């Protein structure tokens, strides 16, 4: 947690923000993103919401702050993030409205009116895409709403990309796989799920990554004191630059 606390924004959100004007702070851009995810289809009183992939709880806490009559369950497979979110739930007195659950989504049971999935699909792995959508259908109530934010790769690049291991898969997210827009449309259609694209955020992701890289380098001495090497610094800078270049 300490590593990410040094260079992420105040909400500790490790996914793209949404820059409407380009002049927002990183924290403001993350809150824009949260608002965009629910705009036009806001949670209703009494909704029981599931978030798959809690991170440090920023989206779940945002929802609870805006909608006082909902409940949220959020899943994680990170013990550190579980401990962090659990402590914050107690600190904010939200035990009756929010649960953080240390569990793989494939093992979870329940019925939810809304399910959110923010930049976790990339880590599912192509061999589990159908398993993932099967589970979403099982957990979602009839007429429920499923919303996700994911990184995609151009349709024309997908087949070549899927046949090899790139830098991200080797060093950052082993087993990960980006979908393409056509692949997402296909799997949504096969699973009888509605599909629409709300926001395309390539420029926002570029800005997010550039701010992360700036923050990382400004805080490097503190990060180094946590036990990270100069070799790690070079690798992390390459990772952030590699990704930001991909969104330009």
Question: What are the roles of these predicted feature ranges?
Answer:
Residues 130-142:
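A short glycine-rich, Lys/Arg-flanked "PGG" loop and its adjoining helix->strand segment in the class I
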Residues 1-40:
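Conserved Class I S-adenosyl-L-methionine-dependent methyltransferase catalytic core
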Residues 45-55:
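Conserved class I S-adenosyl-L-methionine
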């Amino acid at each position: 947690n300490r590593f990410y606390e040094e260079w992420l924004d105040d909400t500790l959100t490790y996914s793209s923000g949404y820059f409407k004007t380009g002049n927002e702070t990183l924290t403001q851009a993350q809150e824009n993103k949260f608002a965009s995810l629910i705009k036009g289809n806001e949670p209703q009183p009494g909704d029981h919401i599931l978030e798959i992939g809690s991170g440090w709880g920023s989206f779940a806490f945002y929802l609870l702050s805006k909608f006082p009559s909902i409940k949220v369950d959020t899943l994680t497979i990170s013990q550190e993030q579980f401990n962090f979110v659990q402590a914050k739930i107690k600190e904010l007195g939200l035990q009756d409205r929010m649960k953080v659950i240390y569990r793989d989504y494939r093992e979870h049971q329940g019925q939810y009116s809304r399910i959110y999935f923010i930049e976790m699909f990339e880590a599912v792995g192509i061999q589990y895409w159908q398993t993932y959508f099967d589970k979403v259908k099982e957990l979602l109530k009839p007429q429920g709403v499923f919303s996700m934010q994911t990184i995609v790769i151009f349709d024309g690049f997908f087949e070549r990309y899927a046949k090899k291991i790139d830098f991200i898969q080797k060093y950052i997210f082993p087993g990960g796989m980006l979908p393409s827009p056509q692949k997402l449309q296909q799997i949504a259609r096969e699973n009888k799920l509605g599909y629409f694209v709300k926001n395309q955020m390539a420029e926002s992701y570029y800005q997010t990554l550039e701010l992360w890289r700036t923050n990382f380098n400004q805080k490097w001495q503190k990060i180094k004191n946590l036990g990270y090497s100069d070799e790690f610094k070079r690798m992390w800078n390459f990772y952030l630059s590699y990704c930001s270049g991909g969104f330009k």
